[in-house]
From Swiss-Prot:
Its main location: secreted. The keyword Secreted applies. Belongs to the beta-defensin family. GO terms for biological process: defense response to Gram-negative bacterium; defense response to Gram-positive bacterium; innate immune response in mucosa. This is Beta-defensin 39. It is found in: Secreted. Residues 1-23 form the signal peptide. The lineage of its organism: Eukaryota, Metazoa, Chordata, Craniata, Vertebrata.
Amino acid sequence: MKISCFLLLVLSLSCFQINSVSGIDSVKCFQKNNTCHTIRCPYFQDEVGTCYEGRGKCCQKRLLSIRVPKKKV
């Protein structure tokens, strides 16, 4: 009885993972040094693709262009 309960526990934990990274889109996102988020990308990041087999968003750091005024010589 204990063995069957243990096997059922292992089976249920392996089948019902929330954030499985086995999706090919997740692997591509991580290879490009981006991050995966399940809800939406933070303010300072742009959405560039999907993760977790289409259930999440692949986010890339936003390039900020800040102009620095030149000193007058």
